[in-house]
């Protein structure tokens, strides 16, 4: 299972939440800092593929938050 698969599984379970990449990393990998950048990269990839919707400006005051794209169905 890849990091992207882990993220999608989490987001399918937490459909109503908007989570930052940091939140996702802490939930999935118990705050292990080594995963933070890989999770952020995977979130960007999933957003570019249309699997995750993103909001926010990406700065410290308004970080990107991710949620399931409305068109994505659970499998």
Question: Model-found features: residue ranges?
Answer:
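Residue-level detector of family-conserved "landmark" positions at structurally sensitive sites
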Residues: 21, 35, 56-57
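Short, cationic-aromatic polyanion-contact patches
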Residues: 57-75
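Short amphipathic alpha-helical interaction segments
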Residues: 33-48
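Short alpha-helical segments that sit at the start of domains
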Residues: 1-13, 17, 33, 71-75
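Short acidic, hydrophobic short linear motifs in intrinsically disordered regions
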Residues: 17-28
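A short, conserved structural fragment
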Residues: 47-57
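Alpha-helical recognition domains of nuclear gene-regulatory proteins
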Residues: 10, 27, 42-45
């Amino acid at each position: 299972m890849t990091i992207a698969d882990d993220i999608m599984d989490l987001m399918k379970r937490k459909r109503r939440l908007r989570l930052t990449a940091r939140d996702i990393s802490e939930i999935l990998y118990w705050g292990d800092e080594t995963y933070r950048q890989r999770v952020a990269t995977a979130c960007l990839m999933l957003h570019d593929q249309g699997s995750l919707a993103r909001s926010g400006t990406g700065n410290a005051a308004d970080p990107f938050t991710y949620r399931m794209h409305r068109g994505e169905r659970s499998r």
